């Protein structure tokens, strides 16, 4: 069996490492460096350059040189972060047929995973050249705050590059592995990993525990910003240079793609120099030209000026740290070590801010450029079975949830969630005086429960009679470190509960998982339509219920004509809801119609409420009813309507 390599697929730079025995080896690429720029250039002769060669020619080929593509991976074109980048990047960011953000080079439309695969292919070749044998398996890292689509897109990039991705792991966790296995300190330690890379920021609170001679790494919490990194710091310098040049020369460089590419290189260089020096000079001769001749750029920037330009960006990293500490249930003083990861953490202002927040100096014995790849290689060794003294927590491969009103799959735990994990949600009944509910547990990515795998079902009985929506049933999903799923349901009023145990990880074969992913892609549009239809039906049902209730209480205050109009509209909506072939537009039209004709009913209720002023609770209830009668959507109050069937007792 070949070695499983560890790859840090970064926004700005990438790195590959392997384990040789218990020693880690960060592998030099063909240019002799241990990190490779995540830059890809598409040339006129169809040649593709990756890394340093691509970076060297970027000034003369800006439209076809792609960098920071990781910021687009797994994202929709309409997302505000993508829209922001469109105006900043010299290359074209376009909308794919499926609505994703893609890029264009030489007129060819390229998906971000396709572009990232070129970098992964270079990492694969780097490892193969060193080992002298084929490499087919890898552990690839992603920011801890990446969502499911971003993780899946990264996995797709690996597959396109000819790699079987054995695991997608979080960058801070990988850095913690690299740090933890290198230390001799005994006992449990809580560490904070502050990861400020080229395009993303993460902070994770991780507990390293010694369990019977094994090292267990448990992520207590994570937070971050997937659109904040060194690229944003560079952009601040670029904007400053453009502004100063415009003041001095009256020329706007922001529309000149060749000049922008030179400015980007100069900004990155200046930023690095200011990490060790107090001042740097940016000197770019022949940056542009106008009628009066060529223009040269010469500008001095001090460290203080740079810090002023990026102060708010550094500050933006502190709130996620605060949230991560709170979510982990620890105090800042409980943190034993602070690890810095990512090249941007070399900036003195960043180190100073981290020290100020955590109250201690960050560790300097971790290489911020290589730690993540090293951790990925360690996990690769664990997955291959060659290392037994490390206990890593698994992830659930597909989302887990329950069926709710309208046959919708309501996800409780998303795929790629690190386990053990626990999640609870309060649901309610769908009918008045419903005495029992059935909880159906599903696994899969489809929006409608029927398209997913039913793992099991159980009943919760003995619910006291009450109007629909009043009982509070808390459903809890709990996945332990063994990947075993425990599902419980509890009536919060009576304390009655029922539980089942499901082995989630053994619930599906790899073939089924692959088929589900294919199905989800093929049927995404159809699923979305069904989901929208279910939402409209739920809205219609709720409006029928609240309008009937309001008519019972206030109908005698209406004119005969008004009451008849409401009853006719009510009947019309009920009929369309009974019609299984009715589409979303037909239901929405009837909902809107009932909303309009019941306006008067809402006014009567409001007037009655004003007149009576009979206690805050009664007033609130009437106002809620008025909102329904007026056609407004009922506020959920954190209680999700769920469809549970009555369980008949023999």
UniProtKB/Swiss-Prot annotation:
One MF annotation (Gene Ontology) recorded for this entry: unfolded protein binding
Keywords: ATP-binding, Chaperone, Nucleotide-binding, Phosphoprotein, Stress response
Coiled coil start-end: none
Induction: By stress conditions e.g. heat shock.
Superkingdom to which the source organism belongs: Bacteria
InterPro entries assigned: ATPase_NBD, Chaperone_DnaK, Heat_shock_70_CS, HSP70_C_sf, HSP70_peptide-bd_sf, Hsp_70_fam
Location of Phosphothreonine modifications: 200
Function field: Acts as a chaperone.
Similarity field: Belongs to the heat shock protein 70 family.
Protein name: Chaperone protein DnaK
């Amino acid at each position: 069996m070949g070695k499983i390599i560890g790859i840090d697929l970064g926004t700005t730079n990438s790195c590959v490492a392997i384990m040789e025995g218990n020693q880690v080896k960060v592998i030099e690429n063909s240019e002799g460096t241990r990190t490779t720029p995540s830059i890809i250039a598409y040339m006129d002769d169809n040649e593709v350059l990756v890394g340093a060669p691509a970076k060297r020619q970027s000034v003369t080929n800006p439209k076809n040189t792609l960098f920071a593509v990781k910021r687009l991976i797994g994202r929709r074109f309409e997302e505000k972060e993508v829209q922001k980048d469109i105006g900043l990047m010299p290359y074209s960011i376009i909308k794919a047929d499926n609505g994703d953000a893609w890029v264009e080079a030489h007129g060819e439309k390229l998906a971000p995973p396709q572009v990232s695969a070129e970098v992964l292919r270079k990492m694969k070749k780097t490892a193969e050249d060193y080992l002298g044998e084929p490499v087919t398996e890898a552990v690839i890292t992603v920011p801890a705050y990446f969502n499911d689509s971003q993780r899946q897109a990264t996995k797709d990039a690996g597959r396109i590059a000819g790699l079987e991705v054995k695991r997608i792991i979080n960058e801070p966790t990988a850095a913690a592995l690299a740090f933890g296995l290198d230390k001799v300190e005994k006992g449990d330690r809580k560490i904070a990993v502050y990861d400020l890379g080229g395009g993303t920021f993460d902070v994770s609170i991780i507990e390293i525990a010694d369990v019977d001679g094994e090292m267990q790494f448990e992520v207590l919490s994570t937070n971050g910003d997937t659109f904040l990194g060194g690229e944003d710091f560079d952009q601040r310098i670029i904007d400053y240079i453009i502004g100063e040049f415009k003041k001095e020369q009256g020329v706007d460089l922001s529309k000149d793609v060749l000049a922008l590419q030179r400015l980007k290189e100069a900004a990155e260089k200046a930023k690095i120099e200011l990490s060790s020096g107090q001042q740097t000079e940016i000197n770019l001769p022949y940056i542009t030209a106008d009628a009066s001749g060529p223009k040269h750029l010469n500008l001095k920037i001090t460290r203080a000026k740079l810090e002023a330009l990026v102060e708010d960006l550094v500050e933006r990293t502190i709130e996620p740290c605060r949230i991560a500490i709170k979510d982990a249930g620890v105090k800042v003083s409980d943190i034993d070590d602070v690890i810095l990861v990512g090249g941007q953490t070399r900036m003195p202002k960043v180190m100073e801010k981290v020290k100020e927040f955590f109250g201690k100096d960050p560790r300097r014995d971790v290489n911020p450029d290589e730690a993540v790849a090293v951790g990925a290689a360690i996990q690769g060794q664990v997955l291959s079975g060659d290392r037994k003294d490390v206990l890593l927590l698994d992830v659930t491969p597909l989302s887990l949830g329950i069926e709710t009103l309208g046959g919708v799959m309501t996800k409780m735990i998303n795929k790629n969630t690190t386990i053990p994990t626990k999640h609870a949600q309060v649901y309610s009944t769908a009918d008045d005086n419903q005495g029992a509910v059935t909880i159906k547990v599903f696994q899969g990515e489809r929006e409608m429960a029927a398209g997913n795998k039913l793992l099991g079902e159980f009943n919760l009985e003995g619910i006291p009679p009450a109007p629909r929506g009043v009982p509070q049933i808390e459903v809890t999903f709990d996945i332990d470190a063994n990947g075993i799923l425990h599902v419980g349901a509890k009536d919060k009023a009576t304390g009655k509960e029922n539980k089942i145990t499901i082995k989630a990880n053994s619930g599906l074969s790899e073939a089924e998982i692959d088929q589900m992913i294919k199905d989800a892609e093929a049927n995404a549009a159809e699923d979305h339509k069904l989901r929208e239809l279910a939402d409209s039906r739920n809205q219609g049902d709720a409006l029928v219920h609240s309008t009937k209730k309001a008519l019972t209480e206030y109908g005698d205050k209406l004119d005969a004509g008004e009451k008849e109009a409401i009853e006719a509209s009510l009947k019309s909506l009920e009929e369309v809801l009974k019609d299984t072939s009715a589409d979303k537009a037909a239901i929405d039209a009837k909902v809107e119609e009932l909303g309009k004709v019941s306006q008067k009913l809402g006014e009567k209720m409001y007037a009655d409420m004003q007149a009576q002023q009979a206690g805050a609770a009664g007033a609130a209830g009437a106002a809620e009813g008025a909102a329904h009668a007026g056609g407004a959507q009922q506020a959920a109050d954190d209680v999700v309507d769920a469809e549970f069937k009555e369980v008949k007792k023999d």
